[in-house]
Amino acid sequence: MTPADYDRLLTVIRALLDRQTRVIAAIDGRCGAGKSTLAAQLQAQLSCRVFHMDDFFLRPEQRTAARLAQPGENVDHERFLSEVLQPALRGEAVTYHPFRCARQALDEPVTVQAARLTIVEGAYACHPALWDSYDLRVFLTVDAAEQLRRIEARSGPEKLRMFQDRWIPLEESYFTAFDLPARCDMALKG
């Protein structure tokens, strides 16, 4: 992301904070685009709370063929809405159960205190079931070659193959079905 794009994003967030008691922003986009990195930078600079869509992967019993055939259904958006967004919209502390991939199960509850600014980062953050909860929606993109380079550097060649075969096609289907790059308030290159 260019410094100018980052500054523009900060300006938009600060303007929202000047006008509203609470702000909830979503950072969606392609894997490897820098969503987690951007959220961490914003958290350090703005003292906000951050929630990761990776903590809301589907549990094994939810991964039905019918569900996965629908764009954007590769995340437990129902649980995310009830455990995170509804309390955040009320200005309350959030208690949620992160999904742990290694165990394929929900972990012990985590409580995050209320904050004026809440950032939600990760693929599927702008799912239609969650869309209206946000004051700002950001789509982060990356070109295909750089995406693969970043994923391999972060996860290794074995995981890269899984991303190419499974995760990237699921994400791209979701982005296309809901026209996210065009619908989000901001589309930035990560």
PLM regions and their residue ranges:
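Hydrophobic positions on the alpha1 helix immediately C-terminal to the Walker A/P-loop
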Residues: 38
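Conserved lysine of the Walker
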Residues: 35
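ATP-dependent NMP and nucleoside kinases share a basic, alpha-helical "lid"
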Residues: 104-154
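Small-molecule kinase domains that catalyze NTP-dependent phosphoryl transfer to phosphate-bearing small molecules
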Residues: 105, 109, 127, 132, ...
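Short beta-strand-centered segment that lines the nucleotide-binding/catalytic pocket of NTP-utilizing
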Residues: 46-61
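Conserved nucleotide-sensing/catalytic segment adjacent to the nucleotide-binding pocket
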Residues: 62-105, 117
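P-loop (Walker A) phosphate-binding loop of NTP-binding proteins
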Residues: 30
